[in-house]
Amino acid sequence: MSKERPKRNIIQKKYDDSDGIPWSEERVVRKVLYLSLKEFKNAQKRQHGEGLAGSLKAVNGLLGNAQAKALGPASEQSENEKDDASQVSSTSNDVSSSDFEEGPSRKRPRLQAQRKFAQSQPNSPSTTPVKIVEPLLPPPATQISDLSKRKPKTEDFLTFLCLRGSPALPNSMVYFGSSQDEEDVEEEDDETEDVKATTNNASSSCQSTPRKGKTHKHVHNGHVFNGSSRSAREKEPAHKHRSKEATPGKEKHSEPRADSRREQASGAQPTAASAAASSAKGLAANHQPPPSHRSAQDLRKQVSKVNGVTRMSSLGAGTNSAKKIREVRPSPSKTVKYTATVTKGTVTYTKAKRELVKETKPNHHKPSSAVNHTISGKTESSNAKTRKQVLSLGGASKSTGPAASGLKASSRLNPKSCTKEVGGRQLREGLRNSKRRLEEAQQVDKPQSPPKKMKGVAGNAEAPGKKASAASGEKSLLNGHVKKEVPERSLERNRPKRAAAGKNMLGKQAHGKTEGTPCENRSTSQPESSHKPHDPQGKPEKGSGKSGWAAMDEIPVLRPSAKEFHDPLIYIESVRAQVEKYGMCRVIPPPDWRPECKLNDEMRFVTQIQHIHKLGRRWGPNVQRLACIKKHLRSQGITMDELPLIGGCELDLACFFRLINEMGGMQQVTDLKKWNKLADMLRIPKTAQDRLAKLQEAYCQYLLSYDSLSPEEHRRLEKEVLMEKEILEKRKGPLEGHTESDHHKFHSLPRFEPKNGLVHGVTPRNGFRSKLKEVGRAPLKTGRRRLFAQEKEVVKEEEEDKGVLNDFHKCIYKGRSVSLTTFYRTARNIMNMCFSKEPAPAEIEQEYWRLVEEKDCHVAVHCGKVDTNTHGSGFPVGKSEPFSRHGWNLTVLPNNTGSILRHLGAVPGVTIPWLNIGMVFSTSCWSRDQNHLPYIDYLHTGADCIWYCIPAEEENKLEDVVHTLLQGNGTPGLQMLESNVMISPEVLCKKGIKVHRTVQQSGQFVVCFPGSFVSKVCCGYNVSETVHFATTQWTSMGFETAKEMKRRHIAKPFSMEKLLYQIAQAEAKKENGPTLSTISALLDELRDTELRQRRLLFEAGLHSSARYGSHDGNSTVADGKKKPRKWLQLETSERRCQICQHLCYLSMVVQENENVVFCLECALRHVEKQKSCRGLKLMYRYDEEQIISLVNQICGKVSGKHGGIENCLNKPTPKRGPRKRATVDVPPSRLPSS
């Protein structure tokens, strides 16, 4: 360091345990400072180079007595030497100052200035704890010579701070971001694994740094971070640590994790008898005297407070620890520093990260998730951890060993990592397993580790927000472990209520991250195939949950070979006979088929809000309470159209009211400062911004007035609400029957068809509820004007429905426009609200049906349907991209020559794929496609999906059962079932209906066959893509379905007449006999119906007509004046009958004055009603002769007589009757395609 460097005025910090920054931060700072303290380093070398070996021996000799001092931040030795520590410079982590009191005090002012400078850099990488390690290395001379290798200047340090993590950083400065032992790992045989663990956790911010006076404690007798063998260290490349240190985004969370790892390690020390296990435990377990040598004061000193949260240091061990005295161990003070710490409620680790990484084999390059256990993965919610939970983290279960129990206690745990560690090594405890200890464990008698003494203190995990009392530290502690026997299950039970699901949900659900993709995991490219474990998964889950689920069979799982996996329609046709009886099958592609999913994180779509507790029966205790609150608010002039949102999650007002009263009312909650606890009980995510302020605001706005009512007034409100419900049900039947189809049945799109972000049956809140007298149904306002008598009736109906229960029959509402990133955050928050740890599909399934059936709490989730024409597909579409032309790419499937839907062109929700974006509990209710079309669904990324399927053959039985269950007052059962009603498969199975089930995982297809009833429940955030297909076998079923939809006045997404005529024209040219023979009978029926209706209209007096796309020059003057020429250019989607929603393709009748469209059947009714054809005009696409000729040509080809269909269409046809005056022939080339 240059002597001309100006000194800074530094405010002296108090050297108290509760002051300053934690040692993890101190180590990080000193790591960086080491590179800029060349002079001091040289001086230390000269002064202590000769006596280093002797000091190490002295350290080893004092290990037995030193452990007592190592057991707390306020240990006896640190108290006695506090004055000496004040003389020791801040870089006492250097060679000898870290081990001896007589360290050079002359450097202290300068070093404190340096430390202060470094503290202002919260994201500065850690590169200096090497000093702590160096004196511990067995060959001190070699280590000292290594110290002098690097001679950075202050200017270099500043350059590194500015350029770290960027390509502009000079190669010569790369080593700034890592400890020296990482770079010299091949040269230094005895370098410490612990230092490498420290560098792994280098990303620590200055948010919680313990007092600087703790420096000498970490260093005194503490050069014990070595001992790991070279071979063990060489197994882990140094780039892992650099990659972690070079990620600034991780640094603000990692320092709390570092502290908690220290505490966990100290709390996880082995018992006296477990020598083998203790070798794999935290570093503090080494120099411990017998507990009898401790005073109560010593035990109290074990618990030190850091930022108001207690920190547990390791306690004394039994006699077996003497066997380890020969090994170099951390000093008493250093032991404290390397234990897990809870800082501001966040569990953090410093020391054990490397050892844990090596044992659990985590994804090293994922931010803030160094291990599969998700303490580090939960970036935002992990601050819910407390002292007691950290103690549980350090514990080990009796059967699985320390590694398993230590991981189990982490709040959101990946169970696979536990099993992996338990099988691999049972020596590690509390996430602390240095390689030195692993080596030592092999040398120590293994029978000495009784598993029962490795019990963790998991029993304390349930108490969030509580400080650990001194008594908790004084419970029979051996090597920092509470000897309390806690069953292994309690480790999982005691996890905090809201463990962060964000990282787990993302890390586990998504199958990889591509560059440029944020943590929302939009990309699903996987380096490894995820198909192999899929098939076995289905079997264990088959009967999971309740016993009644055992009656469900799993749908077939198909694994086509690479050769078979080419054309989806050919493959599906080959297996149809075996799988169609199940209604559905799951297809697992070959391992090498894994297209990458790239979605724009900022794409926006309109969500759909689903009230899970209302998906079954609409009425329940929660809904009743909410109705009372709404009724009271309405009497106060307050309208609550939507529930208040906190963190994107709807607030459960009914539960809020109940809980705040159970806690004594608002005044008591405020006086006792229990708003935080109340928010936790309501499961509001801790990551939600201003959650307490919003919670209090919601109470004052919506509950305060209701809460102030007397019990009598509450009972009166309940009676009024129940009476209103009874009246409503008498008038309209049960709430489940008041579906959106009553007011907007014609908005009911196919169950999977997206339209403006809405799905099947989502109704705007101000929908029409009128019924036309002539047809008994409410026409949908799709034309440009409403029908004549509609307006007055609509007003009357809306006035009737102004009651508080007018929309309580709904369970699905229109949401708001959100980006994909916002949707993911909401999904993460809702997952955290519903589950405290990463749930398995069986757990989600059980909780889902509990919510649906019990209806005791308000659960609102979101989902979205996005047209890929607007936002792009999840499949690759570029010509040069892999899989972009593959047959199973769902953007290619609509053009497959085996699918007759290709003749329709681009139809949203039919031949254009759409994305299904869901979160936990997102539901596709029981339904079948309204056209009975088959479809293929591919799960791009994310959590699993649970599918239920009822084969088409069960239709009649299902209708009777549903009608009985829902008591539909004459409403057909299937109509009620398709009105967003979820009935448990268990109930249906008990009624004798075949229900099949499967769990679709990422990268798998689900194929649904025509007419099957299907429902789906998402297990977390995921993205899938779906598209329809159809073969010629479907046409007969599709034709009958189209007639039924017309009868029920349901809008179809495409015209069946158009499809049949397009097939006839295209296939007749190819002389495709099988296809033509299938559609010939349907064309016959269609021709007869069309010509009969035209004849009846002509007889009724409708003589004015025109052909599509032509300008009628021969029409009368009166007709010419009123003809809306612009209307003739309207698209097919707008040419719907205003009565029955039929798509008019062959012909229609137009009310020119009102610009209203009728199909021929509804026009006949209108003419009979009005007794006049005034203002009406027939519009047609083909005249009678063309229709007859086309059908004859098709029938002729089927019977073997070949003729040209082109001649039939192009030859002039005789014009008969009054039509010839108002008709202009247009050749087929001028006909619009739509």
Curated annotation (Swiss-Prot):
Feature: compositional bias, Acidic residues: 180-193
Stretches for region Disordered: 1-22, 68-150, 169-339, 354-548, 1206-1234
Keyword Hydrolase on entry: no
Modified residues (N6-acetyllysine): K378
An annotated GO BP: liver development
Domain JmjC: 882-1046
Ranges for domain ARID: 619-711
Record PTM Phosphoserine, positions in chain: S78, S449
SMART domains hit by this protein: ARID, BRIGHT, JmjC, JmjN
Region annotated Sufficient for interaction with the PRC2 complex, chain positions: 141-170
Function summary: Regulator of histone methyltransferase complexes that plays an essential role in embryonic development, including heart and liver development, neural tube fusion process and hematopoiesis. Acts as an accessory subunit for the core PRC2 (Polycomb repressive complex 2) complex, which mediates histone H3K27 (H3K27me3) trimethylation on chromatin. Binds DNA and mediates the recruitment of the PRC2 complex to target genes in embryonic stem cells, thereby playing a key role in stem cell differentiation and normal embryonic development.
Protein name: Protein Jumonji
Provenance organism: Mus musculus
